[in-house]
A protein has these predicted regions:
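Peripheral, non-AAA+ core regions of ATP-driven protein-machinery
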Residues: 2-263
Length: 263
């Protein structure tokens, strides 16, 4: 014998599976990582007790000021981010939701990711060294450059490595420092020809830079819009496309002459 359900009973029966589906959807892992401002490091100085840039085969200048490379800190590849976390991070300025594939393009295996990031870092350091020595016209002088930066992977410090090498070897070209005694931060890949490339997480990197005392931030020109959207007060954006352009901009800032590009 069939018993007809009352309207409230029918609604309750229908609501149960719908609620279960919603709960599953809300707490299901999503293909995202949550990132926040990471550490910065002065490439002209030491990081974790080791000199970041060591040069032999040529006189090295004593520098003032700082050139700070910047990073983001993302949830680990095996962390499962759900919808409430995504929504919470979406409305915060100190966090960003990024596709996991953009943060970890090599997959989810932690060891493989570390190897991939270290490979990218080594390639970036080699390119940065070649770019700097070529810019100075000293690529055939037997100058040896060693770059060390513990616990950091990826290619986004390339521009700052090149600038650090230039500052240590040549400064502004007339006896002064590229930084003008300032704390300058930035980000950007670089190739052997000195071309600067875009990176990810720029708004978070500007926050890290401001936190650690920077007043100037070098940004790949293609990412000006993203950098301006959430720019901390007191931080000046300087867009660059090449190593030569970055050096020229810093010299103009230091001397107070010439044109300093802006976003």
């Amino acid at each position: 014998m069939l018993t007809r359900l009352t309207r409230p009973q029918a609604l309750a029966v229908c609501a149960a599976p719908v609620a279960a589906l919603l709960a599953t959807a809300v707490f299901a892992p999503l293909p995202f990582s949550v990132a926040q401002p990471g550490m910065t490091a002065d490439v002209l100085g030491e990081n974790k007790g080791q000199q970041v840039i060591t040069i032999s085969g040529a006189p090295v200048r004593k520098t003032t000021g700082e050139l700070r490379m910047t990073t983001i800190e993302a949830t680990s590849p095996d962390t499962r981010v759900n919808l409430p976390q995504v929504i919470d991070s979406w409305f915060r300025t100190d966090e960003a939701v990024m596709p996991r594939d953009a943060v970890y393009p090599s997959g989810d295996d932690v060891r493989e990711i570390e190897q991939y990031n270290q490979k990218q870092m080594k390639e970036s350091q080699d390119e940065a060294t070649r770019a700097a020595l070529t810019y100075l016209g000293r690529e055939n002088e037997g100058i040896d450059v060693t770059l060390k930066l513990a616990d950091v992977g990826g290619p986004s410090a390339g521009l700052l490595f090149s600038l650090g090498i230039v500052d240590k070897l040549d400064g502004d070209g007339s006896g002064g420092d590229l930084t003008g005694g300032r704390v300058v931060a930035g980000t950007g890949t670089i190739d052997a020809r000195g071309r600067v490339g875009a990176v990810g997480g720029v708004p978070l990197k500007t926050q890290a830079a401001k936190r650690d005392g920077a007043t100037v931030f070098l940004v790949p020109r293609d990412e000006c819009g993203e950098a301006k959207a959430e720019l901390p007060d007191g931080l000046r954006l300087v867009p660059v496309t090449t190593l030569e352009g970055a050096v020229d901009a810093l010299v103009a800032l230091e001397k107070g002459t010439g044109t300093v590009p802006s976003c």
